[in-house]
Amino acid sequence: MYELKENPYPMQPRERLEFLGEECLSDVELLAILLRTGTKKYSSLNLALEILQHFETLDNLRKASINELREISGIGLAKSIEIRAMIEFGKRIQTTNRKRYGQVLSSREYGLSLAFEMQNFEQEHLVATYLDGQNRIIEKKTIFIGAVNQATASPREILYHAIKNLSVGLLVAHNHPSGNLKPSQADKIFTTKIKKSCEDVGINFIDHIIVGAGNYFSFREEEIRK
């Protein structure tokens, strides 16, 4: 639970950040700086505390809509929009840091990148990534949105785009909104089918990755471990 502890320092959050560095500030202090001002009833620190206590975790705050933010006393439309913009900007910075654009270097790196990109998806998405001979990304395409058992019916559309792009390599990935990374029987059957289909047309099937809850499962890594 968040609480506003008595500040042993004579400095306000902005001054503390300037002289001590941002890593020394609490979540409440950092949010107070982003809010800039408080209200007649609350200081920026108290308002920041009210927000964090309301949503309980940073992850809940990250998912909060403009209307949900406006439910808090002192948070109007303008501040709600500013908070949403701040969250989205942070997301884009994090995406840049997590991912080397243009090339797949390993199942781990790409799996973690996809786990971040797909973490807010409430439905299952099947995504195909098409690569050239240097593992550079030619195209990343969402093939299907919905239940996996429907998405796994046929690899035909995946291979259609692979051939169209003159792809040398292929990765496929889908998310489990539940966060459970254990592959289902349908996942295993699909992996076998798409791998065989790639072999038939001379495309290197690199991996099938399952993502959820910020992590990933790699069929390729699992096979290597056996």
Curated annotation (Swiss-Prot):
GO terms for molecular function: metal ion binding; metallopeptidase activity. GO terms for biological process: proteolysis. Gene3D superfamilies: 5' to 3' exonuclease, C-terminal subdomain (1.10.150.20), Cytidine Deaminase, domain 2 (3.40.140.10). It comes from the Bacteria. PROSITE patterns: MPN, UPF0758. Residues 103-225 form the MPN domain. Pfam families: RadC, UPF0758_N. Keywords: Hydrolase, Metal-binding, Metalloprotease, Protease, Zinc. Signal peptide: none annotated. Zn(2+) binds at residues 174, 176, 187. A motif (JAMM motif) lies at residues 174-187. Belongs to the UPF0758 family. PANTHER family: DNA REPAIR PROTEIN RADC (PTHR30471), UPF0758 PROTEIN YEES-RELATED (PTHR30471:SF3). NCBIfam families: PRK00024.1, radc. This is UPF0758 protein LL1007.
